[in-house]
Design a protein with these regions (language model features):
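Transmembrane alpha-helices and adjacent helix-loop boundaries
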Residues: 1-168
Length: 168
């Protein structure tokens, strides 16, 4: 390894690290927020909430990330807004939408892993469904979700390199 060459280009490496971290953190935060709602939607008994959530997750988990980036940057955003956004904005949107699908499955599985008796106990104490979810079910579920959410962050960090194809 020629360390002088690495040292000469250190500013470019630092800029690349900063862009990677920015894409990953923005994509992850948006993906967690949107994924929570999608995960709850997948558990809804209302079909008009359940089916769009289910289809969204299946489509985004079933298509390659690179294809999603191209469609969002070259087709979806220009057709909706009339112009293309920069590569960073398009990349963050693509990462958020993809990460949300995976996070939705993590949230759904985490919530369903909590024994049903917990909800029954909370309801018997007079809590509403929303209160029981917020105060009893979700705290227990989050403990089980931490490892897969960490794995999703690492996967998103790796996927952020695919944004390069629209940045170049």
């Amino acid at each position: 390894i020629q360390w002088e060459m690495i040292w000469d280009y250190r500013e470019m490496y630092l800029k690349g690290i900063w862009v990677t971290i920015s894409l990953t953190v923005c994509g992850y935060i948006g993906g967690v927020i949107f994924g929570l709602f999608l995960g709850l939607g997948q558990m809804s008994k209302k079909k008009w909430i359940y089916w769009p959530s289910k289809i969204y997750v299946d489509v985004f988990r079933g298509t390659p990330m690179l294809v999603q980036i191209f469609i969002i940057h070259l087709a979806l955003l220009p057709s909706i807004f009339g112009h293309s956004f920069g590569w960073f904005t398009s990349g963050v949107i693509a990462l958020v939408l993809n990460s949300a699908a995976y996070n939705a499955e993590i949230f759904r599985a985490g919530i369903q892993a909590v024994p049903k008796g917990q909800m029954e106990a909370a309801r018997s104490l007079g809590l509403t469904h929303t209160q029981a979810m917020r105060k009893v079910i979700l705290p227990q579920a989050f403990r089980r979700m931490i490892p897969p959410l960490g794995n999703e962050f690492i996967a998103l960090l790796k996927d952020s390199s695919l944004v390069m194809v629209i940045a170049a």
